[in-house]
Amino acid sequence: MKQLGFRFRTWGGKRKGAGRKPKGGKRVGHVRRATIGKCPVHVTVRMLPHVWNLRSKRAWAVIGRALYAGACRWGMRLCQYSIQGNHLHLIVEGESLGQAMRGLGVRVARGLNKMMGRKGAVWADRYHAHVLRTPNEVRNAVHYVLTNYQHHTGRITTADYYSSASRENGVTLPRAHTWTL
């Protein structure tokens, strides 16, 4: 009796160069989102690199209008916000966060594209959401959102004009419904 040769597979398994190649950039994973319930949520939305600086008067006019118009729509209530150079921080409450962020994203994208004279996406990725379950977490998140610009630039100001801490920018937000805010 003669022993036959064994053929090894040439695909699959761990080997050099295997797997999906990295695309680069910060990506939000496509995992199932946590249930919100009646807790507030800290949401961060990043813009694509070609989008102009969000902390300009022109961009503020567009984003402020979108935030004001969408503050109490799509099953979401916007409680606090801060606009940075290339991203937004939002503290929101509500049941249907996905629908609300989609609606807000459409408003912001249409306005920014019209301002820049272009078409296409402006959000870099999915939004990042962190559910704030304890009063301490809420307090820390609100402080982080409202003082984010001061923290990153080192400039000490009374209130950031491009955040909900400023009373001069003309955006009045609705009152929160959860007890933690």
Enumerate the predicted regions with their spans.
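Short Pro-Cys-Gly-centered "Cys-loop" motif that presents a nucleophilic cysteine in a tight turn
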Residues: 1-86, 93-181
